[in-house]
Swiss-Prot record:
Segments of skewed composition (Acidic residues): 429-446
Subunit relationships: Dimer of alpha and beta chains. A typical microtubule is a hollow water-filled tube with an outer diameter of 25 nm and an inner diameter of 15 nM. Alpha-beta heterodimers associate head-to-tail to form protofilaments running lengthwise along the microtubule wall with the beta-tubulin subunit facing the microtubule plus end conferring a structural polarity. Microtubules usually have 13 protofilaments but different protofilament numbers can be found in some organisms and specialized cells.
Name assigned to this protein: Tubulin beta-2 chain
Statement: the UniProt record of this protein carries the keyword Nucleotide-binding: yes
Chain's gene name: betaTub85D
Main function: Tubulin is the major constituent of microtubules, a cylinder consisting of laterally associated linear protofilaments composed of alpha- and beta-tubulin heterodimers. Microtubules grow by the addition of GTP-tubulin dimers to the microtubule end, where a stabilizing cap forms. Below the cap, tubulin dimers are in GDP-bound state, owing to GTPase activity of alpha-tubulin.
Tissue: Testis specific.
GO terms, biological process: microtubule cytoskeleton organization; mitotic cell cycle; salivary gland morphogenesis
Cofactor(s) in the UniProt record: Mg(2+)
Length: 446
């Protein structure tokens, strides 16, 4: 029944992916050995979206773990849920990509990609009716960004009619590992624009700000950032994992959320925000949840939605609450802030409710917005890219792996095109006719 194959690539991808499996295994009452210990039919009704049922009633994640060096995988394997994964599904090299996109995409990663695709085929063949793939990776490193995008394009070739969904961590100078992050990110976005159906932009800058300002953590660690990511990932996949009506599979979500094929970069949000140590002590009301969820401070992408307009929005509420109240609050928000929703897509805000709240909370809300304000994030990366590229700084690391400067120029202009497409639809009104250039849709193909 409608399975999703999960792939995690690179250090960041494996860390947030590992955390994701811990959180959803907990929600579905699957312990670290893959045994079910719960008592609710809701937990098992759609368990096979993410898990294979093996012999002896063991549930095994439909997950493939990929990296160009063994380090992170060893720590996943020795972590709390390390034993739940299928041992054959760990695919790793020894050389590492050294934060170099070209190594991940053209040299080291290209050597490993076939063995990953073998595992992908094996997992897909075990599916009754595969709906698509989800990839967790970062755009700033070498493996997740370079090899991750290579995997996407290879999978796209082989499964052109399946949905490709990514959780992509966008780099930020505030939480930076490497100088060349803007290069890697721009080259990756160039690929994501063409080859994915839905991309959740998780932005280290926003995560850092949430930890620092809202959660009052003075020195946020990657563990703290990943805690937010896993809460968000659990939220946006709720509709896929639990029985429900709205956005119940990846394709339906895409149909609701993506008005133009290239504009599929979503801004996730979450409420209530809690740090790892302290879960909330008082339950929030539905109006508070709704207010918080639309607040710029709760966005996992460092963009202010008030600087743009929403093309589409999906909201997922979790916990026992009155549907009537949820609908009223959502209408209320849209009426009060109507100027921030484009008027040429009526009813562009959809709401789903799931009875099972995340662990430690009475109720929570997850937000998925397709906002034109996401251009701020691409602009930020683009400015950093241009600053270095103008001086051709660090380019020899990439050309040394066989890349051409031309590819950088193309990636740069593709990202700038994306920004201006968002800008164009931000300014569009319902009554103007045919002012859109027709080359929008076709302009993307190389």
């Amino acid at each position: 029944m409608r399975e999703i194959v999960h792939i995690q690539a690179g250090q960041c991808g494996n860390q947030i992916g590992g955390k994701f499996w811990e959180v959803i295994s907990d929600e579905h009452c699957i312990d670290a050995t893959g045994t079910y210990y719960g008592d609710s039919d809701l937990q098992l009704e759609r368990i096979n979206v993410y898990y294979n049922e093996a012999t002896g009633a063991k549930y095994v994640p439909r997950a493939i773990l990929v990296d160009l060096e063994p380090g992170t995988m060893d720590s996943v394997r020795s972590g709390a849920f390390g034993q739940i994964f299928r041992p054959d599904n760990f695919v790793f090299g020894q050389s590492g990509a050294g934060n170099n996109w070209a190594k991940g995409h053209y040299t080291e990663g290209a050597e490993l990609v076939d063995s990953v695709l073998d595992v992908v085929r094996k997992e897909s063949e075990g599916c009754d009716c595969l709906q698509g793939f989800q990839l967790t990776h970062s755009l700033g490193g070498g493996t997740g960004s370079g090899m991750g995008t290579l995997l996407i394009s290879k999978i796209r070739e082989e499964y052109p009619d399946r949905i490709m969904n990514t959780f992509s961590v966008v780099p930020s100078p505030k939480v930076s590992d490497t100088v060349v992050e803007p290069y890697n990110a721009t080259l990756s976005v160039h690929q994501l624009v063409e080859n994915t159906d839905e991309t959740y932009c998780i932005d280290n800058e926003a995560l850092y700000d949430i930890c620092f300002r809202t959660l009052k953590l003075t020195t946020p660690t990657y563990g703290d950032l990943n805690h937010l990511v896993s809460a968000t990932m659990s939220g946006v996949t709720t509709c896929l994992r639990f029985p429900g009506q709205l956005n119940a599979d990846l394709r339906k979500l895409a149909v609701n959320m993506v008005p133009f094929p290239r504009l599929h970069f979503f801004m996730p949000g979450f409420a209530p925000l809690t740090s790892r140590g302290s879960q909330q002590y008082r339950a929030l009301t539905v109006p508070e949840l709704t207010q918080q969820m639309f607040d710029a401070k709760n966005m996992m992408a460092a963009c202010d939605p008030r600087h743009g307009r929403y093309l589409t929005v999906a909201a997922i509420f979790r916990g026992r609450m009155s549907m009537k109240e949820v609908d009223e609050q959502m209408l209320n928000i849209q009426n009060k802030n109507s100027s921030f929703f484009v008027e040429w897509i009526p009813n562009n805000c959809k709401t789903a409710v799931c009875d099972i709240p995340p662990r430690g909370l009475k109720m929570s809300a997850t937000f998925i917005g397709n906002s034109t304000a996401i251009q701020e994030l691409f602009k930020r990366v683009s400015e950093q890219f241009t600053a270095m590229f103008r001086r051709k700084a660090f380019l020899h690391w990439y050309t040394g792996e066989g890349m051409d400067e031309m590819e950088f120029t193309e990636a740069e202009s593709n990202m700038n095109d994306l920004v201006s497409e968002y800008q164009q639809y931000q300014e569009a009104t319902a009554d103007e006719e045919g002012e859109f250039d027709e080359d929008e849709e076709g302009g993307g193909d190389e």
